[in-house]
């Protein structure tokens, strides 16, 4: 079963980039036939299969019955993820509180969603309660990067370090203890890396 948590394949990323380029250069999305021509597909069904997979993964929205009924989700704004229910994908519909009209390309790499920060464990890194953390979805992470991690259905923002199977999720506040995870015995999912911050202007 395909979920929004699944990463894009190389071909899916190429098709998404083609859709994005067509929208930016021509002001409209491509047709299925144009996608077939661009990628050498023999049948519009091949394009349709890729499009439906992109929709299932949350990259686009398909409008039934329209030749150019393809909308980029990023054009709708970055989704703001609030409370995350146990066992559900990060970008499940019920987790999205709102969408912010922020250009995802302002961040490098491109932001996929915003996460509402809860608590002060990353205070000394400048990340505080109610901030909106811009996150790039990727399971690939390097030591020293600030990550969004899911551990036993709890989501946390911490600095990532690793020694073999032992992962340490480090806070940036002396009032909090590091989280030590032995990945041989505990499931740890990296939901993405922090690529920017939107400060809550209400404070």
Swiss-Prot record:
- Catalysed reaction per UniProt? Hydrolysis of Ala-|-Gly bond in repressor LexA
Its name, as the record gives it, is LexA repressor
- Name the residues annotated as catalytic in the UniProt entry: 121 (for autocatalytic cleavage activity), 158 (for autocatalytic cleavage activity)
The leader peptide range reads none
EC assignment: the record states: 3.4.21.88
Q: Which domain of life is it from?
A: Bacteria
Describe the task this protein carries out. Represses a number of genes involved in the response to DNA damage (SOS response), including recA and lexA. In the presence of single-stranded DNA, RecA interacts with LexA causing an autocatalytic cleavage which disrupts the DNA-binding part of LexA, leading to derepression of the SOS regulon and eventually DNA repair.
- Site described as Cleavage, positions? 86-87
- GO MF: DNA binding; serine-type endopeptidase activity
* The UniProt record lists the keyword Oxidoreductase: no
- By its UniProt entry, which NCBIfam families does this protein fall under? lexA
- Which CDD domains would you find in this protein's record? S24_LexA-like
Q: Which family does it belong to?
A: Belongs to the peptidase S24 family.
What SUPFAM superfamilies does UniProt report for this protein, alphabetically?
LexA/Signal peptidase, Winged helix' DNA-binding domain
Q: Which residues bind DNA?
A: 32-52
UniProtKB keywords: Autocatalytic cleavage, DNA damage, DNA repair, DNA replication, DNA-binding, Hydrolase, Repressor, SOS response, Transcription, Transcription regulation
């Amino acid at each position: 079963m395909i979920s929004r948590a699944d990463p894009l394949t190389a071909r899916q990323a190429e098709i998404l980039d083609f859709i994005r380029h067509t929208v930016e250069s021509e002001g409209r999305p491509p047709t299925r036939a144009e996608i077939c021509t661009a990628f050498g597909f023999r049948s519009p069904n091949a394009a349709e299969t890729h499009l439906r997979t992109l929709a299932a993964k949350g990259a686009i929205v398909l409008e039934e019955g329209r030749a150019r009924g393809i909308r980029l989700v990023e054009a709708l704004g970055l989704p703001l993820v609030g409370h995350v229910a146990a066992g559900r994908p990060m970008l499940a519909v019920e987790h999205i509180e709102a969408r912010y009209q922020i250009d995802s390309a302002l961040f490098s790499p491109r932001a996929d969603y915003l996460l509402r920060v809860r608590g002060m464990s990353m205070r000394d890194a400048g990340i505080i309660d109610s901030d909106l953390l811009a996150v790039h979805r990727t399971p690939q992470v390097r030591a020293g990067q600030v990550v969004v991690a899911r551990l036993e259905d709890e989501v946390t923002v911490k600095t990532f370090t690793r020694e073999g199977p032992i992962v340490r999720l480090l806070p940036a506040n002396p009032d909090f203890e590091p989280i030590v995870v032995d990945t041989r015995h505990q499931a740890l999912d990296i939901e993405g890396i922090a690529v920017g911050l939107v400060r809550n202007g209400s404070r």
